[in-house]
């Protein structure tokens, strides 16, 4: 049985960053965790906030087993504090690089720009 927080975070990692590097996937997880801490909300509450993560109200458990397993592993590592990362320097948001405001950019990882 997978804990709800791990499932929600894994869904975000999968749907927002599959195809990105492992660092990019950890960075997406960091943003979710940063928001959870800052807003004193659960991981699932953060994921399902209106207009925050594209299509999150329609996300389903993926059929791509390898990418899904990696998403579960990353979510588990992050939430169980097995792996501590700080790729985003405390970023609260990310966007596709082509749509991101240049003046707020903290770091670019793959196709995403992370900012506060």
Predicted regions located by residue number:
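Bacterial extracytoplasmic/cell-wall-associated proteins, especially those involved in peptidoglycan
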Residues: 5-116
């Amino acid at each position: 049985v997978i804990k709800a927080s791990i499932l929600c975070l894994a869904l975000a990692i999968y749907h927002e960053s599959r195809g990105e590097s492992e660092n990019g996937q950890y960075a997406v997880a960091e943003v979710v965790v940063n928001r959870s801490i800052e807003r004193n909300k659960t991981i699932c509450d953060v994921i399902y906030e209106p207009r925050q993560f594209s299509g999150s109200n329609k996300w389903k458990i993926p059929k791509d087993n390898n990418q899904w397993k990696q998403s579960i592993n990353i979510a588990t590592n992050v939430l169980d504090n097995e792996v501590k990362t700080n790729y985003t320097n405390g970023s609260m948001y990310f966007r596709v690089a082509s749509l991101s405001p240049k003046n707020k950019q903290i770091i670019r990882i793959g196709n995403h720009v992370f900012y506060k």
